[in-house]
A protein has these predicted regions:
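Short acidic, S/G/P-rich loop/turn micro-motifs used as interaction or catalytic elements
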Residues: 30-31, 102-107, 136
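N-proximal low-complexity "stem/linker" segments adjacent to membrane-targeting elements
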Residues: 1-34, 41
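Catalytic-site signature of metal-activated, phosphate-bearing donor transferases
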Residues: 4, 108-289
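Short, high-confidence coil segments that cap the C-terminus of an alpha-helix
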Residues: 45, 91-92, 123-128
């Protein structure tokens, strides 16, 4: 169902959105829109919201099953504004957010759905989940100049690292159970990426509550939401497998002509399976065996 704006969608669908986990997809361009929306339906989100320009089209089957709203996706803080509006509308509900050509993976997602995972995560008294944005890229940029190919997607199997996250209010002391994570294309081609956008950590899954606010760096106003685990043991982490950085590097005139391939000696074909991500240490099951 299509709505003229996100506020109209929320007003019309508020009761519906309260019945199950919600995925919010911000559609920045016309690349892999349908596959992104279908993927998040298939892994178990009850409601998928597509925020997109009016001129973009969807296949009929997707158009009938997602909640579409016309939205200024290029406006300042477009994602933060949208997520905060949805947060205020569905207190207590789990919400996920991503961009088009991004795909959420979590441990055992081939045999367990997102509602099962979130139920377990809730039982562990967690209200948010850390994910790493894992860059995907086509192996042959001459054949796929926008760097996007589902059938020939590759990822970096190493080259990831973490640094302590400084608490500026405490003189730069490390924040408890918070780290800044780096790697992938934003690390290998960092000269083309603004410093503030080099992190690959995101808190894309969270439980909505009154007054909560998503910030521009993909962290929340409640610091506990930004932690990678509870104090007593490790928790589930997820991965967002994303073509977004590769697309940007091959679209931006400042980097387009400097990059002829994204492949290097640590590239590996992406298998589109959670087992590969677990084996590479790019997410973990915590206590969810």
């Amino acid at each position: 169902m299509a709505h003229p704006s996100l506020t109209d969608l929320i007003a019309a669908e508020r009761d519906t959105l309260a019945t199950g986990p919600v995925a919010v997809v911000l559609v920045e361009d016309d690349v892999e829109i349908a596959t992104t929306l279908r993927h998040h339906q298939q892994i178990g989100f009850d409601h998928v919201i597509a925020l997109m320009p009016e001129e973009f089209t969807l296949p009929a089957d997707v158009e009938q099953t997602v909640l579409r709203a016309t939205y200024d996706v290029y406006g300042p803080q477009a994602m933060e504004t949208a997520v905060n509006l949805v947060n205020d509308a569905v207190p207590g509900q789990w919400v996920f957010y991503c961009f088009n050509a991004e795909y959420l993976f979590f441990p055992f997602c081939e045999t367990r759905n997102v509602k099962e995972m979130l139920a377990f995560h809730t039982e562990e008294r967690r209200h948010a989940m850390l994910a790493y944005v894992i860059d995907l890229y086509a192996d042959d940029l001459s054949q796929y100049p926008d760097a996007v190919s589902l059938d020939h997607a590759h990822l970096d199997r190493s080259g990831y690292y973490a640094l302590a996250r400084a608490d500026l209010e405490r003189g730069g002391e490390p924040k408890e159970r918070q780290l800044d994570f780096f790697g992938g294309l934003r690390w290998r081609f960092e000269e083309h990426v603004p410093t503030a956008r080099r992190k690959i950590d995101r808190i894309p899954l969270f439980r909505a509550k009154k007054g909560l606010r998503l910030r521009e760096d993909h962290t929340f106003s409640d610091e506990e939401y930004n932690t990678y685990a509870c104090p007593w043991h490790h928790n589930i982490t997820a991965a967002i497998c994303s073509f977004r950085t590769a697309k940007a590097l091959k679209t931006n005139p400042g980097s387009r002509y400097d990059i002829h391939t994204f492949k290097w000696h640590n590239s590996a074909p992406f298998e589109w399976h959670s087992r590969q991500l677990l084996d590479l240490g790019l997410m973990e099951p915590g206590q969810w065996f």
